[in-house]
């Protein structure tokens, strides 16, 4: 019997289609089971290629929303945790210098994920907003992730498009596996929530 694997095991090695798939499947499971805790250590990678959220009532340090604790959580706080979870899976780093919501203030700038994944980076920033009412809902996350996952898988089916010559070391498509530890947690201002739709 193979040892169980979790999304924490692929942190920094996750491609864009897989990241959208994780968001799509986990947001749906959170809504279905009314679970208010999520982090990379309780999302199991199944043998059939899907992802399963394991039951948990205790959060890991660095993945709780600024307004949440072990007794006061709601959908908005779990959306924040899901954004922090996705950031960790893609970047192999924790938000707010590992402190999570405990280290976030209303004036804090939000971490920007990857220059070549602008839609996902924007959506994660929306999840990590300090004010709970400014975050997307689980349904909005699921709908956006479903659309973007379909786009990614269609692009894989059609094959790569021609890309312009890079203007700098941080332009274009750069594989996370080859750049672990290279990407800084840069900061970027955000704007009022507007659910992502494909242009």
Give residue spans per PLM region.
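Activation segment of protein kinase catalytic domains, centered on the conserved DFG
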Residues: 8-21
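Protein kinase catalytic-loop region centered on the HRD/HxD motif
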Residues: 26-37
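Conserved end of the kinase activation segment
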Residues: 67-76
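Structural helix C-cap motif within protein kinase domains
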Residues: 91-95
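Conserved C-terminal C-lobe helix
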Residues: 115-128
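Terminal C-lobe "cap" of eukaryotic-type protein kinase domains
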Residues: 130-155
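Regulatory extensions appended to serine/threonine kinase catalytic cores
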Residues: 153-199
């Amino acid at each position: 019997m193979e040892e169980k694997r979790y999304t924490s095991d692929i942190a920094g090695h996750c491609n864009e289609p897989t990241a959208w798939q994780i968001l799509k499947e986990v947001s749906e499971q959170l809504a279905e089971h009314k679970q208010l805790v999520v982090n990379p250590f309780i999302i199991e990678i199944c043998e059939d290629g899907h992802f399963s959220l394991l039951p948990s009532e205790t959060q890991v340090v660095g993945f709780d929303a600024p307004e949440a604790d072990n007794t006061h959580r709601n959908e908005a706080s779990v959306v924040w945790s899901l954004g922090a979870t996705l950031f960790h899976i893609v970047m192999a780093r924790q938000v707010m210098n590992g402190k999570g919501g405990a280290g976030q203030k209303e004036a804090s700038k939000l971490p920007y994920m990857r220059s070549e994944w602008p839609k996902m980076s924007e959506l994660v920033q929306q999840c990590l907003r300090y004010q709970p009412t400014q975050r997307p809902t689980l349904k909005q996350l699921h709908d956006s992730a479903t659309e973007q996952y379909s786009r990614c898988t269609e692009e894989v089916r059609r094959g790569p498009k021609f890309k312009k010559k890079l203007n700098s070391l941080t332009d274009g498509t750069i594989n996370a596996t080859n750049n672990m530890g290279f990407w800084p947690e840069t900061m970027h201002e955000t704007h009022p929530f507007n659910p992502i739709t494909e242009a």
